[in-house]
Amino acid sequence: MRKLLVLCSFWLCVATLGAQNAERKLYSVAFYNLENLFDTIHDAGKNDYEFLPNGSYQWTAKKYESKLQNLSKVLGSLSRDLVPEGPAFIGVAEAENSRVLEDLVKQPAISNYEFVHYEGPDRRGIDCALLYDPKQFSVTHSKLVLSTPFEGDTVHLTRGFLIVGGQLAGERVCVIVNHWPSRGAKSPVRVHAARQVKALKDSLMRSDKKL
């Protein structure tokens, strides 16, 4: 089967993998928008001022900790009714930096997860990342591919494409985590993002015939 997954908004995929003659096992994967997971510390060069204690959201440590707890409960409950172990990996969007991801996976509900993240050029500092359970999914390589603007539009810009390769159930799997511009952007901007994802997918499948 094809084992290249594109994780973006509105997708929840459940796949069965395994050798043809082996007992088949159910795995789940997911995508979740963290919706502005910011800490309370200013990142130099980033426009994160709204999410500071003296910013417009009055973003305090108490509010931050509450958001971490609430997110971890939701993420920790994903697909548990079908797969007791939870998702093998979860693509996430709108994480400010590695610090917030470290704080997130320290929460008891998802303490079994690790993460892959690269700092991108987004002006507000929000990025995509991949949370993964190392007991189910073993990461072998990863990289961030920057997006190109549509006709010079740097306002509605896709926040990079996180590519993560690894082993799931003994088979090679490659994931593209991406977060397109909102529906407030013009349709051609979103189509441009889709075409970039397709080009990446095609390139990956040409270079690895086993995907």
Please place each PLM-identified region on the residue numbering.
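Structured beta-strand-rich core segments of catalytic domains in phosphoester-bond hydrolases
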Residues: 91, 95-172
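Flexible, glycine-rich surface segments
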Residues: 182-211
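N-terminal, active-site-proximal structural segment of metallo-dependent hydrolase catalytic domains
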Residues: 19-110, 118-126, 194-195
